[in-house]
Amino acid sequence: EIYESILKELQSAGSSGEFYTPRAVTDFMAQMIKPKIGETMADFACGTGGFLVSWLKELQKQIKCTADAEKYGKSIYGIEKKQFPYMLCITNLLLHGLDIPQVYHDNTLLKDVLDYTDDDRFDVILMNPPYGGSEKADVKNHFPNDLASSETADLFMAVIMYRLKKNG
């Protein structure tokens, strides 16, 4: 109950300029994508894990055997820059049955996008990139010149381009 009240508080109002996508929206988007067991999904600014949980709720309906359950547990990948939302995300995923969530406390924009390989790509990228922010000049160094920008949302779109599988 405490976790749910903290989550609702964060989702209903911006916290330090952050706004979280309402659960009804994350659920709707996951339903429209129609995830399948074996597909991988990423959210590179996952906040408290709303998109990750919505994806898992859709996948959970399809689990029919142990192999499906193992794929389910490895189907999501998240990164969150800020400590408090990251901790809430881990808690959220533990409460939804993931023993070892593949979610990391890191800054998505601080890795050179040209270093990503096919192994770093996902079938689906389901997220709400941070809008309205600007990044320091050194962050642009992680992107090719034609994609370098100080706009946070533009940089996340570039990351998405480099991390989505060819037919994703």
PLM region descriptions:
Residues 8, 68, 138-139:
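Generic signal for short, ordered secondary-structure residues
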Residues 131-159, 163, 167:
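Mobile active-site "lid"/loop adjacent to the S-adenosyl-L-methionine
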Residues 1-10:
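Long recognition/docking surfaces used for binding and targeting
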